[in-house]
């Protein structure tokens, strides 16, 4: 028996496996994107309460991961849409017909390593993302009690200062919280990308 038939039905929350499978496929296709439950339900023909219940079940069973947004005001974090990721990057790659992690699949891989690192820290930091109303975005923000570290992920082997625009915007917005940032890339060298951004091969930190 599969995870679907055995484990989830044992939780007595999946009354329609066909609907659940459709929603899982929709989740796989949205890795790294903002979670819009209304849109997702409309795309797969599932009513909103069921979408909400199934997503909660995916998260409770360690399949889906909802990444919260960074905001200094913690109340605002609760109302901002989370980003959706998947706990099994290899499975997500297989279902997408890919063999190497690129784009959002590379983001997903990096996130899994960040979460594994977070879980063994004595003072557990938070892992979040940042996005402005105008669409400027940073893939991940590591928040400790005193400081934050913004991180951007690029699969390209060659990166330039223009790839750090989101990171620089974050550093400008929160000068009292962050004074540096990381850009993880697909190349082989570690070097200063800008005065405040260090470029590091992603495989050196994952």
Predicted regions and their residues:
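Switch/connector loops and helix/strand junctions flanking conserved nucleotide-binding motifs
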Residues: 94, 160-161, 190-194
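Domain-level recognition of nuclease-like catalytic cores that cleave nucleotide substrates
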Residues: 186-206
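Short glycine-/polar-rich loops that comprise or flank the Walker A/P-loop
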Residues: 146, 176-180
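Arginine/glycine-rich "motif VI" loop of SF2 helicases in the C-terminal RecA-like domain
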Residues: 119-122, 169-177
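Short beta-strand-loop-alpha-helix junction that forms the active-site gateway
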Residues: 153-161
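Accessory nucleic acid-recognition modules appended to NTPase machines
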Residues: 1-148
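Short beta-strand/turn micro-motifs composed of small residues
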Residues: 131, 154, 183-185
């Amino acid at each position: 028996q599969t995870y679907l038939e055995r484990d989830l039905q044992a939780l007595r929350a999946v009354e329609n496996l066909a609907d659940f499978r459709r929603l899982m496929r929709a989740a796989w296709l949205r890795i790294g994107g903002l979670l819009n439950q209304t849109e997702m339900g409309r795309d797969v023909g599932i009513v909103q309460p069921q979408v909400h219940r199934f997503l909660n079940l995916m998260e409770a069973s360690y399949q889906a991961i909802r990444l919260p947004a960074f905001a200094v005001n913690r109340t605002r974090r609760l109302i901002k849409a989370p980003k959706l990721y998947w706990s099994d990057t290899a499975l997500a790659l297989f279902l997408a017909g890919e063999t190497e992690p690129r784009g959002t699949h590379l983001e997903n891989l990096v996130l899994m390593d960040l979460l594994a690192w977070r879980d063994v820290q004595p003072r557990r930091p938070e892992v979040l993302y940042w996005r402005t109303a105008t669409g400027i975005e940073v893939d991940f923000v590591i928040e400790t009690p005193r400081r934050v570290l913004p991180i951007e992920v690029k699969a390209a082997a060659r990166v330039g200062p223009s790839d750090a625009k989101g990171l620089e915007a974050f550093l400008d917005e929160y000068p009292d919280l962050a004074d540096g940032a990381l850009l993880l890339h697909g190349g082989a060298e570690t070097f200063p990308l800008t005065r405040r951004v260090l470029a590091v091969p992603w495989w050196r930190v994952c």
